[in-house]
A protein has these predicted regions:
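N-terminal intrinsically disordered/low-complexity leader segments
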Residues: 1-5, 197
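Short, basic, alpha-helical segments at the C-terminal edge of helix-turn-helix-like DNA-binding modules
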Residues: 5, 30, 60-67
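Helix-turn-helix
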Residues: 11, 15, 19-53, 57
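Alpha-helical DNA-contacting segments of helix-turn-helix folds
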Residues: 56-62, 119
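Hydrophobic alpha-helical connector segments
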Residues: 57, 71-99
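Short linear capping/connector segments at secondary-structure termini
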Residues: 71-78, 107-114, 143-145
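Amphipathic alpha-helical packing segments from all-alpha helical-bundle domains
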Residues: 95-96, 114-140, 151-158
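Hydrophobic/aromatic-rich alpha-helical bundle segments in the mid-to-C-terminal region
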Residues: 105-109, 138-188, 196-199
Length: 199
């Protein structure tokens, strides 16, 4: 039976994700990935330049959605309600966790040794800079709001987001419990931003 190139590539990615989840990036070997995928190591290199590229390809959907959170902060397109709309925020967090739980585990806990091992701190710094610029744009649209919020607080707010994701990944909870916890977190967040911004 002849396998299509796309099928082989998908098989490699599926096998690699299993190995990464079991061993983490650092201890996963190309030999084991090849064995699990039923191909030779040299065959893997027809599709991926190295182990890092495989890892990044697996995590691409997770990374795309996280970066979308940053690049969707366009003051020209958004209203102040983005900070106050708890239903929208609850849905976003819930869907993100449900869709990416295993891959979030890879990114947050098993990326040591990969090009993504410092992703959390790099993302936090980028989010802090982006939100600061976003606040300037929002101030022009809503002159009454307070944007005198320290960069360190914005930084901490992103750190808390990762803490939320970590806890939900580490502790498998029933759907109802997760819904309640996310609702509590978002209620706390939206009330806090409303108070800080005098919105």
């Amino acid at each position: 039976m002849q396998f299509l190139k796309g099928d082989i590539q998908e098989g490699i990615l599926k096998a690699a994700e299993e190995v990464f989840l079991e061993k983490g990036y650092k201890d996963a070997s190309m030999r084991e990935i090849a064995s699990r995928a039923g191909v030779t190591v040299s065959n893997i290199y027809h599709y991926f330049t190295n182990k890092d590229e495989i890892f990044r390809t697996i995590l691409k959907p997770v990374l795309n959605d996280l970066y979308a959170m940053i690049y969707n902060h366009d003051a020209d397109q958004m209203t102040i309600d983005v900070f106050m709309d708890s239903d929208y925020q609850k849905m976003s967090v819930r869907e993100y966790i449900s869709e990416h739980r295993d891959r979030l585990r890879l990114l947050l806990f098993q990326a040591q040794g990969s090009v993504l091992e410092n992703f959390r701190s790099e993302y936090t710094d980028l989010m802090t800079r982006t939100i600061s610029v976003f606040f300037q744009g929002m101030k022009q649209k809503y002159p009454h709001i307070n944007i005198a919020i320290t960069n360190f607080f914005i930084h901490l707010n992103t750190v808390w987001l990762f803490a939320l994701l970590e806890e939900l990944v580490l502790h498998p909870v029933k759907k109802e419990e997760m819904e309640k916890f996310i609702a509590e977190y978002i209620a706390f967040e939206t009330a806090g931003w409303k108070e800080l911004m005098n919105a």
